């Protein structure tokens, strides 16, 4: 008893359609997830949020939204991979926040869909200010998407 010759082709088409649907839905989920994570991180006022991070949100006007998001992800990654930052989060028992920053980085990279972006920003700001401004930008993006 064999399978009809058209069955594998049909299954492949269904699988491809499902993957496209899931990928599209993932994009709809990422932005609210980013905002939720930023809400959690900005509510907590801890010593580690006073640490300095590259001000990747101060971008030239001709920067695309994807580039800006990619720069923010790069700045976050460079920030949380630094040994002094990891030490601060461990010292103050904030490993959950460190995990949230890593997840935020992953989600921002997914939103940007860029593999390489500049990451050396001259200006510095506190993590607290960076996260507040990023949250405002993401909320504005979400509002535009809803209207």
Swiss-Prot record:
Q: Which PROSITE patterns match?
A: INTERLEUKIN_4_13 (PS00838)
- Using the UniProt annotation, give the residues that carry a glycan (glycosylation sites): 62
Instruction: Look up the domain of life of the source.
Output: Eukaryota
Q: Which GO terms describe its biological process?
A: B cell activation; immune response; interleukin-4-mediated signaling pathway; negative regulation of inflammatory response; positive regulation of DNA-templated transcription; positive regulation of macroautophagy; regulation of immune response
| Listed GO CC annotations | extracellular space
Leader sequence range is: 1-24
Q: Where in the cell is it found?
A: Secreted
What keywords would UniProt list here?
Answer: B-cell activation, Cytokine, Disulfide bond, Glycoprotein, Growth factor, Secreted, Signal
Main localization, broad class = secreted
Give GO terms: molecular function aspect only.
cytokine activity; growth factor activity; interleukin-4 receptor binding
List the disulfide bonds in this chain.
Answer: 48-88
Task: Check the record and name the Pfam families matching this protein.
Answer: IL4 (PF00727)
Q: Main role?
A: Participates in at least several B-cell activation processes as well as of other cell types. It is a costimulator of DNA-synthesis. It induces the expression of class II MHC molecules on resting B-cells. It enhances both secretion and cell surface expression of IgE and IgG1. It also regulates the expression of the low affinity Fc receptor for IgE (CD23) on both lymphocytes and monocytes. Positively regulates IL31RA expression in macrophages. Stimulates autophagy in dendritic cells by interfering with mTORC1 signaling and through the induction of RUFY4.
Q: What family does this chain come from, according to its entry?
A: Belongs to the IL-4/IL-13 family.
Protein name, as recorded = Interleukin-4
Gene designation? IL4
């Amino acid at each position: 008893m064999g399978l009809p010759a058209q069955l594998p082709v049909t299954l492949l088409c269904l699988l491809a359609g499902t993957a496209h649907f899931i990928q599209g839905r993932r994009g709809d989920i990422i932005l609210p997830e980013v905002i939720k994570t930023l809400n959690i991180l900005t509510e907590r006022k801890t010593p580690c949020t006073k640490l300095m991070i590259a001000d990747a949100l101060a971008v030239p006007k001709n920067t695309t939204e994807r580039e800006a998001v990619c720069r923010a992800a790069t700045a976050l990654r460079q920030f949380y991979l630094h040994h002094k930052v990891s030490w601060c989060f461990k010292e103050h028992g904030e490993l959950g926040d460190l995990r949230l920053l890593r997840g935020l980085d992953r989600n921002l990279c997914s939103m940007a869909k860029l593999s390489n972006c500049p990451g050396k920003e001259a200006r510095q700001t506190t993590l607290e200010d960076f996260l507040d401004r990023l949250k405002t930008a993401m909320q504005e993006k979400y509002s535009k998407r809803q209207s």
